[in-house]
Amino acid sequence: MKPGKPRGTGGGKMARIHSHERQWVGALLLVGFWALAVAAPVEANPYLTKPGETRTAVKIGTCAVTGGFIHLYAAVENSLFEKYGLKAEHVFNRGSSISLAALASGENQFLYCAADATIPGMATGLDIKLVAAPLVGLPYVLITRKDIRTLEDLKGKALAVTRPGDLTYRLTKALLKKFNFGPDDVKMRPVGGSQPEQYQAMVADIVQGTVIVPPLDVRARHDGFNVIYHLNDLDLPFIYSSVHTNSQMLKEHPGIVQKVVAAMAESLYFVEKNPDKAKAALAKVLKLDDLEALQSAYNAFTKDLVNRRLTIPANAVAETVEVARENGTDVKRKPAELFENSFAENLEKSGFLKELWGGEIPGKKK
């Protein structure tokens, strides 16, 4: 008998055994791949609350009442934070200075505000950082009374601002500088409050114009007032609605920070896919039932300005700090010390964003 040739039926039996083994191995591999495929979405969203996990209470302040915060309003109203193990309380603050103070003291754990309004204050030494930027761009317009139809008509008039140094003040100052108005040509009058109060000051002719964001532009037109300038044409670096937190949260509770950022990322998707629910949340906060105005706000803040990756553009932070320095701010912190992109970057690295959007993330990187 030649070497290697099986004797009798033993070789055939062994061959059948090896064949069965290969089938079992193949089946096990198939089951393994299937299990991985099923588990992948769970792994891609590691931030969801787990069974039996106690929700963590957090306070999220806002610095104004505006259509630009539609994503936060929708997240709170539709319990998105609860999915991530958070019991979020929305706290209304008035103005960036008050809001930053509440965050720095620990009264609030998070702040949702236009970063351009907060960066100058943060740069003076406040131990606060930006951790996500859902909206990037400048949505403001200048509205004026009926007799003011052009920028030239502003001479001898007054424009409302919240308070000296605040965002409306700096935007109005940049606008007047752009068109060579001197300090005696157009006055900036602090009226406090938020955009609705500034609008009412214009209605009462205490001032003759103010910078606002949608949906107040629709109301202004309905009331016979004019929209005479879109501030996006100033070509200023501008980071709008952003998530802020303090050093204590970053050091002691980074997991909670990550969950808040994840919830806000989902809110971008939710608002885009559920316009009626988003507008209902906005209507509740703004106490507004004008469907045209609500649609105006929805269009303004859910399309061109949306930054689905939530990363903070470093160049815009640096330019905003430089503008603040030129305007007399005592800058004590470097631009890179004012933001932390790791939480937003984790969403993409983990596969969370790809799963959320069902593939490639829409839109360009900002």
PLM regions: where:
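Secondary-structure end/capping motifs
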Residues: K251-R333
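Conserved C-terminal helix/tail region of periplasmic/extracytoplasmic solute-binding proteins
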Residues: E322-K366
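Bacterial Sec-dependent signal peptides at the C-terminal "C-region" and cleavage site
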Residues: L36-P46
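Bacterial N-terminal signal peptides that target proteins for export
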Residues: G4-G8, K13-L28
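Bacterial N-terminal signal peptides
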Residues: G26-V38
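Short, glycine-/small- and polar/acidic-enriched structural segments
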Residues: A44-A204, Q208-P214, V227-P237
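A short small-residue
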Residues: N45-L48, S241-Q248, F301
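Pocket-lining segment of extracytoplasmic ligand-binding domains
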Residues: D116-A117, M188, P196-K287
